[in-house]
């Protein structure tokens, strides 16, 4: 009950200070599992997106929150846990590198090399037929191979439970007009959860509400623009996908 009252109070404060306008282009608000990915300007980004979503989406969407910042005081931790149902991410954790075994086959086991035809080779005959290229790992294998120490592990658990999440692929707050290059987390999640809809979002003006280092918010009109979903194409490499996703976010700035 207390969390519900605090939710209504915070929603009123955020909308009073920012207007919290949500604009949907090519992607109507829909109760389906999604990964919303947006530019990152302020700690208030999480709060603004939460307030911009309609109630039926807020209840199934969990924003990520920097653990070191949002658990610094008991009040912050209670709000992010009880009100936002946030997913805490340890910014100091080191992402796990994929092993050769996982990259080789869906089951996580390395592909066995075909035995060489020694007699044919020694006789000067044709070499054995080359092996077929290893199949890409399945989403299930990728999730199973992710260690609990990986910073993506809490996000994977949230998605496995059916929740939608809000992430900021830059990994840290930007200071320019455009977001910084996206880190690999969005690509990995797209590989692990191909059925989840990836929705870009552009957050406008929130850095002026709560500039870095300030504790008192400044009233100013803000908006969140949601765009058409993007999808990881078959065989698409990490950097081309991340650059394309970043461009989808930037394009919403002009809508």
Where on the chain are the PLM-derived regions?
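A charged, well-structured terminal subsegment
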Residues: 99-108, 157, 225-241, 245
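Hydrophobic/aromatic beta-strand patches that form the interior of the parallel beta-sheet core
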Residues: 64, 87, 199-201
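A cross-family acyltransferase "interaction/gating" segment
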Residues: 75-78, 164, 172-236
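Short glycine-rich anion-binding loops that position phosphate/pyrophosphate groups of nucleotides
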Residues: 40-42, 170-173
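Membrane-anchoring hydrophobic helices of lipid-metabolizing enzymes
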Residues: 1-48, 53, 58-61, 71-78, ...
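A conditional alpha-helix N-cap/helix-loop micro-motif detector
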Residues: 144-149, 179-180, 238, 242
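Short, charged beta->alpha transition segments
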Residues: 74-75, 149-160
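Residue-level preference for the first positions of well-ordered beta-strands
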Residues: 33-35, 162-168
């Amino acid at each position: 009950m207390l969390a519900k009252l605090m939710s209504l109070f915070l929603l009123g404060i955020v909308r009073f200070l920012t207007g919290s306008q949500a604009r949907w282009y090519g992607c109507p608000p829909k109760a389906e599992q999604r990964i919303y990915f947006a530019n990152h300007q302020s700690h208030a980004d999480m709060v603004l997106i939460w307030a911009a979503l309609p109630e039926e989406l807020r209840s199934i969407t969990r924003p990520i929150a920097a653990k070191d910042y949002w658990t610094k005081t008991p009040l912050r931790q209670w709000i992010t846990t009880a009100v936002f149902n946030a997913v805490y991410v340890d910014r100091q954790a080191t992402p796990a590198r994929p092993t050769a075994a996982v990259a080789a086959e869906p089951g996580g086991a390395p592909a066995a090399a075909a035995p060489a035809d020694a007699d044919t080779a020694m006789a000067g005959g044709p070499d054995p037929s080359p092996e077929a290229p290893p199949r890409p790992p399945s989403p299930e294998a990728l999730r199973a191979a992710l260690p609990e120490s990986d910073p993506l592990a809490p996000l994977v658990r949230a998605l496995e439970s059916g929740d939608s999440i809000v992430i900021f692929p830059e990994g840290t707050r930007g200071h320019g007009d455009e977001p910084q290059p996206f880190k690999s987390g969005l690509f990995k999640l797209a590989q692990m959860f191909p059925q989840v809809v990836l929705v870009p979002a552009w957050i406008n003006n929130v850095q002026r509400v709560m500039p870095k280092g300030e504790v008192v918010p400044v009233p100013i009109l803000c908006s969140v623009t949601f765009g058409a979903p993007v999808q990881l194409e078959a065989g698409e490499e990490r950097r081309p996908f991340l650059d394309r996703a970043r461009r989808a976010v930037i394009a919403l700035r002009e809508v």
